[in-house]
């Protein structure tokens, strides 16, 4: 079986632009949640979010391209550029037909839809942008990355709500394993902090309403959690066949060893209460990686800060790991970033790889009130030095989609 390693990483997040800044903030337990500034949220139940601060797309992308991209694509392009640059991919030692792209989004160009709908109503159909459709479709980021670099290998997108990033990376991993590509650029990107997007989540009663103290709002596994905090960002990695990476002396961050996925088949938004869906995906990922539960040293939990999700995921971890569940550090970086929806998997895999590299587990901040039904070691409030050889990263999405990755220190 062909082995697959990570040779590049790129991240745009509410706690830092670029891997270096993200890493520093991650281990310091930096809060990235604040009042919404993208629009006036004064009439909303939830008025807080994990926004990417001071993001100016014109600093990174040509002006003409910026005007033809939704924000979710802009974020994804910047993350991909960092990942490709750090992987040191050059034209000289790579056939573009062997390089593919799989970068997904859970929502796509929602901001563009809202803007163009307003133009339609106010000025008529003739004034709607001819770039509306390519700006809103979820596969456009994959396409634009390929166009920019000339990568002509496998190219598509995945959209499985909050499991999108993990599904994208997992499928890219399998594409390389079976020999359909040598290198895949994979991950997720999202920018859904828009009037309509936030209104929809508010109507579902899914979001935290801790508006007066936004820095305390995202509190996974805490007894006082009251919903997730919407965020935005992008996480993109470069996956590469091991021998190919070694041949060109590429930097190696870690090895992807397992991928598992499943479907709750239960409810459109709520996870099944006993966690059997994510449990099935975790077991499949371990089986795929040929790893026993006792070998896992860290779990980057989905941990959304919602009453249902955190309880179900905790139960699933107990079912999979038995007594070992109480000995494994389990943390949710959403406590710092908020919930990045389709970008979550990519950003959290990067967090897991940084934990492997540095031997430091990022904390779950705002963990103050233990919940009897969430009683694992959630690495409360402060990062911890831990020898990590194998890590697991969980993602769960609306619709009951579950995707789990297992990564190994290289």
Placement of each model-derived feature along the sequence:
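ACP-dependent fatty acid/polyketide chain-elongation machinery
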Residues: 1-65, 87, 243-253, 350-364, ...
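Conserved small-residue
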Residues: 8, 26, 80, 101, ...
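Conserved catalytic cysteine-centered active-site region
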Residues: 34-78, 108-171, 180, 203-229, ...
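Short, well-ordered amphipathic alpha-helical segments that serve as non-catalytic structural scaffolds
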Residues: 76-87, 141, 168, 240-242, ...
């Amino acid at each position: 079986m062909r082995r697959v390693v990570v040779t590049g990483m790129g991240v745009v997040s509410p706690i830092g632009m670029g891997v270096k800044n993200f890493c520093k903030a991650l281990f310091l337990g930096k809060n990235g949640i604040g009042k919404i500034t993208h629009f006036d949220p004064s009439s909303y139940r939830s008025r807080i979010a994990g926004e990417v601060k001071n993001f100016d797309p014109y600093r990174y992308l040509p002006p003409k391209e910026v005007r033809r991209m939704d924000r979710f694509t802009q974020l994804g392009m910047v993350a991909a550029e960092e990942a490709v640059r750090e992987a040191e991919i050059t034209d000289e030692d790579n056939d573009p037909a062997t390089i593919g792209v799989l970068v997904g989004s859970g929502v796509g160009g929602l901001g563009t839809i809202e803007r163009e709908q307003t133009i339609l109503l106010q000025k008529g159909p003739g004034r709607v942008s001819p770039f509306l459709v390519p700006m809103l479709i979820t596969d456009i980021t994959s396409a634009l990355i390929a166009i920019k670099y000339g990568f002509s290998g496998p190219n598509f997108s995945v959209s499985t709500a909050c499991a999108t990033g993990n599904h994208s990376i997992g499928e890219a991993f399998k594409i390389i394993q079976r020999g359909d590509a040598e290198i895949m650029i994979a991950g997720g990107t999202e920018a859904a902090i828009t009037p309509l997007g936030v209104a929809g989540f508010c109507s579902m009663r899914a979001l935290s309403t801790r508006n007066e103290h936004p820095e305390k709002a995202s509190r996974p596994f805490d007894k006082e959690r009251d919903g997730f905090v919407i965020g935005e960002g992008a996480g993109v990695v470069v996956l590469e066949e091991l021998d190919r990476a070694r041949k060109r002396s590429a930097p190696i961050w870690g090895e992807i060893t397992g991928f598992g996925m499943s479907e709750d088949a239960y409810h459109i938004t709520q996870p099944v209460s006993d966690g059997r869906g994510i449990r099935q995906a975790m077991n499949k990922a371990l089986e795929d990686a040929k790893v026993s539960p006792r070998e896992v040293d860290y779990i980057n939990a989905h941990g959304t800060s919602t009453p249902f999700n955190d309880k179900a995921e905790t139960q699933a971890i107990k079912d999979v790991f038995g007594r070992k569940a109480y000995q494994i550090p389990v943390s949710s970086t959403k406590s710092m970033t908020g919930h990045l929806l389709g970008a979550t998997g990519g950003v959290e895999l990067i967090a897991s790889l940084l934990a492997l590299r540095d031997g430091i587990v990022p904390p779950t901040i705002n963990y103050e009130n233990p919940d009897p039904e969430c009683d694992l070691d959630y690495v409360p409030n402060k990062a911890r030095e831990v020898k990590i050889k194998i890590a697991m990263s969980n993602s769960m999405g609306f619709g009951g989609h579950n995707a789990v990755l297992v990564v190994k220190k290289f």
